[in-house]
């Protein structure tokens, strides 16, 4: 796989607070190779390594997108959920930014059934058929639709398992990460100083709490996916 240039700037990462880690008491010793300094009780990640692994991740998603592969972005933290949704829309990816539905990937047949139901209900609503139901039945169906939309709305067009999953917070999204590991889906993950760098296929040392840091990392990945997709579209015209 040929390496490409993704305009990853250390000063930009410093400004976004990418290097800020957790307090030294909360660290994972496995993160030692990715930490550059300890200052006032806080660990700071080595941004040179962040740039290296972010570049590798961009290369991976670029080449995957250029071959028509599908991506899933997972970030269910309230403060970062909007960033994940924006990234998914921009890159035309699938997204889970509410509570992770247990077994979503490992029990894919059940998820498929629920997605079919969601799409059917959306079509029924658009056609105005829900309004023809009795009030009680209409209310029950609308509650079901709202629930499905909340938890599966970001993947409603997903017709198969994703090829690559991008996980923004290892601790918050451990269930999703574990499902990916179980069925062998490659993962890209942001890892703060309290994370395990060995779990994801590509781990990007970065602050996974600050919105500015999350957006910067996602922006780079989204740009790489979009670049890859444009090449795929041109090849298939």
Swiss-Prot record:
A Pfam family this chain is assigned to: Ribosomal_S2
Keywords, in A-Z order: Plastid, Ribonucleoprotein, Ribosomal protein
Domain of life, per lineage: Eukaryota
Record carries keyword tRNA-binding: no
Biological processes, Gene Ontology terms: translation
Gene Ontology CC: one annotated term: mitochondrial small ribosomal subunit
PROSITE patterns per the UniProt record, alphabetical: RIBOSOMAL_S2_2
Gene Ontology terms, MF aspect: structural constituent of ribosome
Compartment annotation: Plastid
Protein's UniProt keywords contain Cell division: no
Family classification: Belongs to the universal ribosomal protein uS2 family.
Identification of the protein by name: Small ribosomal subunit protein uS2c
């Amino acid at each position: 796989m040929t390496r490409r240039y993704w305009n990853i700037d250390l000063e930009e990462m410093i400004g976004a607070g990418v290097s800020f880690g957790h307090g030294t008491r909360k660290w994972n010793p496995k993160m030692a190779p990715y930490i550059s300094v300890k200052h006032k009780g806080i660990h700071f990640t080595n941004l040179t390594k962040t740039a290296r692994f972010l570049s590798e991740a961009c290369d991976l998603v670029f080449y995957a997108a250029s071959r028509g592969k599908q991506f899933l972005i997972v970030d269910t933290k309230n403060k970062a959920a909007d960033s994940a949704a924006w990234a998914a829309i921009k890159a035309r990816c699938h997204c889970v930014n509410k509570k992770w539905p247990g077994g979503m990937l490992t029990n894919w047949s059940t998820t498929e059934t629920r997605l079919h139901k969601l799409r059917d209900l959306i079509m029924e609503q658009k056609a105005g058929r829900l309004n023809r139901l009795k009030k009680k039945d209409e209310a029950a169906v609308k509650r079901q639709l709202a629930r499905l939309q909340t938890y599966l709305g970001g993947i409603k067009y997903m017709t198969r398992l994703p090829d690559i999953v991008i996980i923004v917070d290892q601790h918050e999204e451990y269930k999703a990460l574990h499902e990916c590991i179980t069925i062998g889906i490659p993962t890209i993950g942001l890892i703060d100083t309290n994370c395990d760098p060995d779990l994801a296929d590509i781990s990007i040392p970065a602050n996974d709490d600050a919105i500015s840091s999350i957006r910067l990392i996602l922006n780079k990945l989204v740009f790489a996916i979009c670049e890859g997709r444009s090449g795929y579209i041109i090849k298939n015209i």
